[in-house]
A protein has these predicted regions:
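Short internal beta-strands
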Residues: 321, 345-354
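Cofactor-cradling patches in redox/metallo enzymes
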Residues: 311, 320-330
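Hydrophobic alpha-helical segments
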Residues: 311, 342-345
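ATP-dependent carboxylate/acyl-activation modules
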Residues: 1-201, 205-319, 353-354, 358-365, ...
Length: 389
């Protein structure tokens, strides 16, 4: 579960990490009072549109403003709008709040500081770079030598040697070691106690006073651990999530909306990826990733079809099922039920393979529905594209 910047920094500040003075507003009527508390007469304040996406600055969603009338115009423009960045897609994301931050610039240095769960090593990895304030992907591509990662065994936790290694990479003055060490330990505590899946502070700034400050923060919480944190569950902002993805999560379906026009329903994440790949291989684009899982039932298949056809971009549907534990004849009956129930008129091609595949294909052929059953994934992809065109 992703958090807004102001929510992330509130959690970090609660763990003792240094964050700027800031207040989030949801209505323009709140602006004048908040401006009095946050803005500096000479430097104004930083106003940031709150969305779950990067690239806000380049999209016009972050401004340093010195006068209240300028801030009022910005808030009026942003609140209730759709902010489009390189990470949001063409539809953008809804702006329901604006964060007013004290202007802490100029600063001595901007750093990158991140933490992520490394599933391969089953450890938490710190990622640091002296090049902060820019997209870390750009740094990784252009100057990878400026990024360093330090893997931490969860059984031992952060040790002084780990902190010294990061400190050396950041090329900081010796007198800053105690403050940096304190920051690392606070971040480790927050990451573990609050079950973060990702923490990104970009930039972590070093002020002229020698003080570290989290100028921006991104936090993703581990969905599987949310049951331990009811106080964090209320931080979810469903306006930032695709409605179909939210509905799929409630139904325990793995769904990701994409930009194409061929809806996909598959059992198994790997098979779903292969299905999308072959659609792209033959020149079309998938409209979604949808894994109904190994425990597919008639109800889950029906819900999956409803999700797919709720997307107006979908012009055809490809179903790819490999029957193992799940029998293909059961899936075929579920497909027939779903197509009848939802009155789906779009072209549908079904590839069944494995357990009771022949029986499943017979049921589809005798259903009287305009659904085509094929044996191979290659044939399925070619046929659905032919029907689409």
């Amino acid at each position: 579960m992703n958090l807004h910047e102001y929510q992330a920094k509130s959690l970090l500040a609660g763990m003792g990490m240094p964050c700027p003075k800031e207040i989030a507003i949801q209505q323009i009527s709140q602006l004048a009072d908040v401006w009095q508390h946050i803005a500096c007469p000479s430097k104004g304040a930083v106003l940031k549109a709150q969305v779950h996406a990067g690239g806000r600055g380049k999209a016009g969603g972050v401004k340093v403003l010195k006068q209240l009338p300028e801030a009022q115009a910005f808030v009026q423009q942003m609140l209730g709008s759709q902010l489009v960045t390189y990470q949001t897609g063409s539809e953008g994301q809804y702006v329901s709040s604006i964060l007013l931050c004290e202007n802490i610039y100029p600063v001595r240095q901007e750093l990158y500081f991140g933490m992520v769960v490394d599933r391969e090593s089953q450890r938490v990895t710190f990622i640091v770079s002296p090049e902060g304030g820019v997209e870390i992907e750009k740094v990784a591509h252009e100057t990878p030598e400026k990024i360093s990662s330090v893997s931490i065994d969860p059984l031992t936790g952060v040790q002084p040697c780990h902190i010294r290694e990061m400190f050396a990479v950041l090329q900081l003055e010796h007198g800053l070691f105690a403050a940096f060490s304190r920051l690392v330990n606070q971040a480790w505590k927050a990451f573990n106690e609050l079950d973060f899946a990702l923490l990104e502070i970009n930039p972590l700034v070093l002020r002229e006073t020698g003080e570290f400050m989290c100028a921006d923060a991104k936090v993703s919480l581990d969905d599987n651990a949310l049951y331990r944190h009811p106080e964090l569950q209320v931080l979810r902002d469903e306006t930032q999530e695709d409605p179909r993805e939210s509905q799929a999560a409630k139904l325990d379906l793995n769904y990701v909306s994409l930009d194409g026009n061929i809806g996909c329903m598959v059992n198994g994440a790997g098979l779903a990826m292969a299905t999308m790949d072959i659609i792209k291989l033959y020149g079309e684009q998938p409209a979604n990733f949808l894994d109904v899982g190994g425990g597919a039932t008639q109800e889950r298949v029906s819900e999956a079809f409803r999700l797919i056809v709720s997307d107006s971009k979908v012009k055809a549907i490809l179903v790819n099922i490999f029957g193992g534990i799940v029998r293909c004849d059961m899936i075929a009956r579920a497909i027939i039920h779903a197509l009848n129930e939802a009155r789906i008129t779009l072209p549908v091609v079904v590839r069944l393979s494995g357990n009771n595949a022949a029986e499943g294909q017979r049921l589809l052929a005798e259903s009287g529905l305009t659904v085509e059953a094929v044996d191979s994934l290659d044939d399925a992809a070619k046929r659905i594209i032919a029907l689409l065109n």
